[in-house]
Amino acid sequence: VSGTGAAGECRPSLARGLWALTYRELKKWLKDPVTLVMFVLQPLIWMGLLGKSLNIGGLFSANIISLPPQVPIPGDAILHPPGLQGVVLNGEALARMFADMGPGIMKGAFGVADYFSFMAVGIVSMIVVTTTMFSGMSIVWDRRLGFLDKVMSTPVSRAAIIFAKILNATLRAMFQATVILALAYLLGLQLSPTFTPLNLLGVYAAIFLLSVGLSSIFIAFSIRSTRIERPMHFVGLITMPLMFSSNAFFPTRLMPSWMQAVASVNPLTYLTDAIRQLTILPLDATALLWDFTYLGLFAAALATIGIVLSWRCLTR
């Protein structure tokens, strides 16, 4: 206990209140098998159907590159030796040459030779965002069902109520990211030679920072609502712009300049890049340090704003 009031009532410590409320949230989630199955099926469908069907590397295969048996080259296109009237190239050999260039083109564009590995990490980031936001939505049901009022009438700290929601969202995001990475590996995710199990700690740290920031601000938005439709519309409004204005599914350097500017301030860009650096790309310590610096500043700023706003709502 943290102390005794004038009436002799024991006030639970912040840690005990935090544990009790977090345990309640996780227990509800783990006891709902339908929700657990859906959380696994959703990324599996994205990776199994969309990830495998978007075989961008296959565009460079010899079977796809269609060239005539003979490819004439005019003389004015030949620099050396000079004076040739023209040459005729073997179309099949030329197609094989282009196919051999495919992995290099893919690595130059995506950093990896297969698009599935690139996209699988993007799906991890996407699921982290959606899980974090939807986890904060449970506070709307707590308010509608009267549970929030009951908790607020007890000696439990208001901070424990807020931190429990944030911790629940973060733990769920980490759990789902682990499941998605395991499924992606089974489906063909190619890990970098520099990958070690310790890299997973960095992955969890990056997910933790983004989840804390997003869940804090989303809880502050949802805590004032008694209708579930409002936060659901909010999630639908910002999820797609966050995903498609980041590097989750497409490299930022191939985007238009105005979208590159948007991606440069999108926190999802830095989460995705950090996870890729730690899993499928050769480790770039400078880039990774910048990713964590941005995510840390993002988490600190949004967590401060979100917690202060939620605190004011609970204490007024």
Protein language model features and the residues they cover:
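Hydrophobic alpha-helical transmembrane segments of multi-pass membrane transport/permease proteins
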Residues: 31-59, 96, 117-131, 176, ...
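Junction motif at the cytosolic side of a transmembrane helix
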Residues: 2-3, 57, 279-283, 292-316
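Membrane-interface helix starts
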Residues: 23-42, 289, 315-316
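Membrane-interfacial helix-loop-helix junctions in multi-pass membrane proteins
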Residues: 85, 103-114, 194, 243-301
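Alpha-helical transmembrane segments and their short interhelical loops
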Residues: 158-235, 285-307
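Short, membrane-interfacial amphipathic segments enriched in basic
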Residues: 2-23, 214, 258-269
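Hydrophobic alpha-helical transmembrane segments of multi-pass membrane transport proteins
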Residues: 72-99, 108-187, 218-219, 237, ...
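Transmembrane helix segments
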Residues: 48-60, 222-265, 269
